Amino acid sequence: MQAKKRYFILLSAGSCLALLFYFGGLQFRASRSHSRREEHSGRNGLHHPSPDHFWPRFPDALRPFVPWDQLENEDSSVHISPRQKRDANSSIYKGKKCRMESCFDFTLCKKNGFKVYAYPQQKGEKIAESYQNILAAIEGSRFYTSDPSQACLFVLSLDTLDRDQLSPQYVHNLRSKVQSLHLWNNGRNHLIFNLYSGTWPDYTEDVGFDIGQAMLAKASISTENFRPNFDVSIPLFSKDHPRTGGERGFLKFNTIPPLRKYMLVFKGKRYLTGIGSDTRNALYHVHNGEDVVLLTTCKHGKDWQKHKDSRCDRDNTEYEKYDYREMLHNATFCLVPRGRRLGSFRFLEALQAACVPVMLSNGWELPFSEVINWNQAAVIGDERLLLQIPSTIRSIHQDKILALRQQTQFLWEAYFSSVEKIVLTTLEIIQDRIFKHISRNSLIWNKHPGGLFVLPQYSSYLGDFPYYYANLGLKPPSKFTAVIHAVTPLVSQSQPVLKLLVAAAKSQYCAQIIVLWNCDKPLPAKHRWPATAVPVIVIEGESKVMSSRFLPYDNIITDAVLSLDEDTVLSTTEVDFAFTVWRSFPERIVGYPARSHFWDNSKERWGYTSKWTNDYSMVLTGAAIYHKYYHYLYSHYLPASLKNMVDQLANCEDILMNFLVSAVTKLPPIKVTQKEQYKETMMGQTSRASRWADPDHFAQRQSCMNTFASWFGYMPLIHSQMRLDPVLFKDQVSILRKKYRDIERL
């Protein structure tokens, strides 16, 4: 044992001596090196740094393992104070790790709600058309305010979309211009839109100026640089992308099985060198020229011939054989590989064409990924597994393909078909972050009609909206509230309004009746109204304008609303049948008086007709049933300009409601029975409401059609040839077998 102890002591002593010799040698070499530098500095009259620099710098070997936010230049930070270090780290945190909780001032939004201020455009500043469309969408939205003191969010008027220094759209000296804005406040509560950042050869995501604490609404943003719950990933869109409206998706009908001529297609540039070239250079391995057609061309850029390889000529020849549009509309899947940047125009093109996108862009934060579940509309691939893509998509079941295709159409029409929808979706996402207690859930964002038309301020319960009864396993309401719009004084007990009130009150589904008194004369005495089995509430309109009939009155206690003009002639049986039909289509307008629209080629404008034809696109609200949520949507979604037009003309409110409901549902209204309800000339000439007999009334409705279509950016009305009649309607059977037998006698 004693021998072992001696050996152990000797070994320990030797190890200690070796370590002392090693560190002493390092210090001696550092000292000699310092002495030489000191002599050299003395000869040149230079002052030498502190002796702290003599010590060996062991952390250098560990530098690759230091977190990025702690990596500093030690030479420049050795002498800074602890407070300066904290300030430096704080600055990094605010810029790189910003979240809503740390870099956004919520107090501005609590005062006046979610209002957005766009800086006024400065003289001499060039603004690309795409950015002008973004600003126009903001200024035309219900969020816009021209008063910065009322604003919760600020958007620059300086064009930040294209930050590629080689682009003609690049705005120079943006750093100083932004810093000079008196409301900038280091970017706090600011939103910056950007489509292109960086330039050849690395295409970094740097926008070229210090954004401070501003949020980014950015295309082609990587998951590495994306700040969750702060930035918003938007799609890359072209300068030709429509400002409003936009074309609908190209899926006109569902084919079963949902397979097309091509299984997988792509046609685009092949980058011979540089970033983004790896994947596109390898596409030829997957191309089979039959159902998998992946075409690339080398012909792009000024010096492509300098870099051309042995495959270029063959690829270029094959590329010219196929028409891109024909491939796009006849393919089941469309490959969306990355380009120089992560995003690609092919993404939106595939969505619109109902071609399921196969994403091949590792690290791309997909557009609006915070709210959209892309697994329901796309196949997320991996660039490293390119050769497995064909077998992967072939294994997808046909039911799944059909569901993916339908979801592409919904997402395209709900969020991507226009610049306005992209901007409004961005703003709605930010608003949901601010007011989390009334924010939309994933079901709202990913199911028809989408987040832009479902306003959570109306209700936080999905059962209060007409779109989710099936999802929640609920039945539509079993009662309705009749709202009668009265504009003429009550002078006789035989007036149509009193007969209408009695007929509606006798319905087994009627919960109450509200009379909206928009007449200039005082309210009639209570005894003038007939006695009914249901409550009758008379509301005197404050402004007595046409739009007041669609206000979301608290007195309406049911989800279903039976909207009636005072001159409407309906029986109780007709009311019951219409409500029964509506319960099967609670998201649509169901009623009696039908009208239609058409395109007048000679005048190049939309026309309105009340002629009895084989189709219709509107059901007027003088005798119709719909969900009361549309009152809220009419009041809070539509711009004041359209409602003011309706009020000034005392006309077109029913047309505007049809535009709104069709825009939301993407479906036509439903007409019941063949009865022709009142025409435009039925109203008596002695009434203040003789607007129906006014020759200018019809011309005004023509004008309204075009104004409304202009605001929506497209014509949302949809023609229908469907009319619903009672079972056995006019069949040669016993009248006792018919439930709604009185309808045949009318």
UniProtKB/Swiss-Prot annotation:
Chain ranges on the Cytoplasmic side, renumbered to this chain: 1-7
Biological or metabolic pathway of the protein: Protein modification; protein glycosylation
UniProt-annotated binding residues for UDP: 267, 269, 271, 280, 319, 324, 346, 349
Listed name of the protein: Exostosin-1
Membrane-protein topology: Single-pass type II membrane protein
Cited function: Glycosyltransferase forming with EXT2 the heterodimeric heparan sulfate polymerase which catalyzes the elongation of the heparan sulfate glycan backbone. Glycan backbone extension consists in the alternating transfer of (1->4)-beta-D-GlcA and (1->4)-alpha-D-GlcNAc residues from their respective UDP-sugar donors.
Cellular location(s): Golgi apparatus membrane; Golgi apparatus, cis-Golgi network membrane; Endoplasmic reticulum membrane
